């Protein structure tokens, strides 16, 4: 059963108003601001926001094996305190456009290049406190080559059948949100094509 919460009509589409913003941290990958805002409800609030230049995620699909296979990376993530299976991804450098960043990240981390690219999703990583927009690209027509990961990246790369990756999501073996988004998107596309035959 769905529940609907009614909002006051005058506040429904209004935004919070920024009263002040102070940078409290600046590092090589992101900065943090402490913002004072006036919420649409009229309440003053402090919001600590991680400011990020944005990221790209690559759903690299090999369609030459009968069933689609997706390229996943396994690497240790200190914040999660564990190894995670993930789609290739990375930060957009300042001044860089998302598509060139996606092509660069796929080649650096996996060695693969792709002939066909399409942006399929655009979403926020964790909008409660992180200002990081992510663009998810579908990459097809893959060609293998040498990887050039950064010095601090130890990445194991492997193709998984889409069916297996979807099971990994449902079992919690894939626990990374951007990867879950990509796997579910491709699973839905495959189901839609199957139904329309």
Language model: regions and residue ranges:
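Short beta-strand micro-motifs in enzyme catalytic cores
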Residues: 31-35, 83, 133-135
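Acidic, metal-coordinating catalytic segment for phosphate/diphosphate chemistry
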Residues: 20-59, 65
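Short loop segments at secondary-structure junctions
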Residues: 41, 62-65, 76, 140-144, ...
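Conserved Nudix-box catalytic region and its N-terminal flanking loop in Nudix hydrolases
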Residues: 8-9, 13-15, 66-104, 108, ...
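Long hydrophobic alpha-helical segments typical of transmembrane helices together
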Residues: 166-197
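Extended interaction-bearing regions that mediate binding to partners or small molecules
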Residues: 6-26
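Unchanged
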Residues: 45, 54-57, 91-177
């Amino acid at each position: 059963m769905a529940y609907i919460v009614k909002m006051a009509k005058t506040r429904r589409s209004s935004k919070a108003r920024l009263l002040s913003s102070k940078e409290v941290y600046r590092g090589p990958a992101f900065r943090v601001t402490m913002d004072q805002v006036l919420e649409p409800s009229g309440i003053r609030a402090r919001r600590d926001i991680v400011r990020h230049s944005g990221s790209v995620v690559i759903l690299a699909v090999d369609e030459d094996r009968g069933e689609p296979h997706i390229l996943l990376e396994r690497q240790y993530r200190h914040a999660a305190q564990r190894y995670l299976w993930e789609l290739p991804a990375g930060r957009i450098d300042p001044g860089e456009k998302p598509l060139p960043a996606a092509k660069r990240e796929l080649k650096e981390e996996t060695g693969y290049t792709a002939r066909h690219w399409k942006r399929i999703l655009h979403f926020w990583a964790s909008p409660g406190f992180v200002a990081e927009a992510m663009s998810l690209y579908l990459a097809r027509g893959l060609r293998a080559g040498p990887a050039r990961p950064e010095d601090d990246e130890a990445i194991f790369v492997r193709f998984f059948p889409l069916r297996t990756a979807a099971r990994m999501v449902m079992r919690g073996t894939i626990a990374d949100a951007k990867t879950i988004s990509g796997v579910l998107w491709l699973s839905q596309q495959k189901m839609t094509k199957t139904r329309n035959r």
